[in-house]
């Protein structure tokens, strides 16, 4: 959704400055919000509207930087997770579940357009830094959900065998699992 609760106005103000400064760069926005949407009026900005998940992933594969400056407490930052897993240098706010999705993104110290502008500009100007953020995000262990699920399953099976749990007679009532 492209609205102020998702920080779209923060993105708008920062990206207009970036596009004015770096004429060769292009910026894209994905989403279909109809109400209260800030307008980005720039020749190098493209509003793509609604895209399927597959189309979003294709665009992320071709992108260098992704921005998720949400104001509201995101329950889970899927956009940040997917952006980072596709090799984007990902900039996020410190809201809700966003910081938990990757250990290798840039977290805005202050949630405003000037701070976002500075972080995007730093990524643009410092290629080695940008490449490091991209590579570290791409290689983040949190993206390995299939592999992590196999590890958790193996631990569960070993506990069942170790404690000779019988699910018919002695059902587990409560299970609390933390990330290892």
Feature annotation, model-predicted:
Residues 57, 80-85, 99-100:
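Short alpha-helical segment that forms part of, or immediately flanks, the ligand-binding pocket
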Residues 89-92:
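Short hydrophobic beta-strand element within catalytic cores of glycosyltransferases
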Residues 95-107:
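Short acidic/histidine- and often glycine-rich active-site loop of Leloir-type glycosyltransferases
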Residues 106-114, 122-127:
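Conserved acidic donor-binding segment of nucleotide-sugar-dependent glycosyltransferases
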């Amino acid at each position: 959704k492209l609205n102020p609760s998702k920080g779209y106005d923060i993105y708008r103000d920062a990206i207009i400055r970036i596009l004015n400064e770096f004429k060769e760069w292009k910026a894209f926005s994905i989403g279909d919000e109809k109400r209260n949407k800030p307008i980005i009026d720039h020749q190098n900005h493209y509003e793509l509207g609604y895209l399927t998940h597959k189309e979003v992933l294709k665009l992320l594969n071709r992108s260098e930087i992704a921005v998720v400056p949400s104001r509201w407490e995101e329950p889970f930052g899927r956009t940040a997770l997917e952006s980072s897993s596709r090799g984007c240098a990902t900039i996020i706010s410190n809201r809700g579940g966003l910081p938990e999705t990757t250990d290798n993104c840039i977290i805005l110290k202050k949630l405003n357009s000037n701070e976002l502008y500075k972080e995007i500009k730093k990524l643009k100007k410092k290629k080695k830094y940008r490449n490091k953020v991209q590579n570290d995000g791409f290689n983040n262990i949190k993206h390995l959900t299939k592999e992590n699920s196999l590890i958790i399953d193996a631990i569960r099976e070993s506990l069942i065998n170790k404690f000779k749990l019988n699910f018919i007679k002695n059902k587990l009532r409560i299970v609390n699992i933390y990330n290892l």
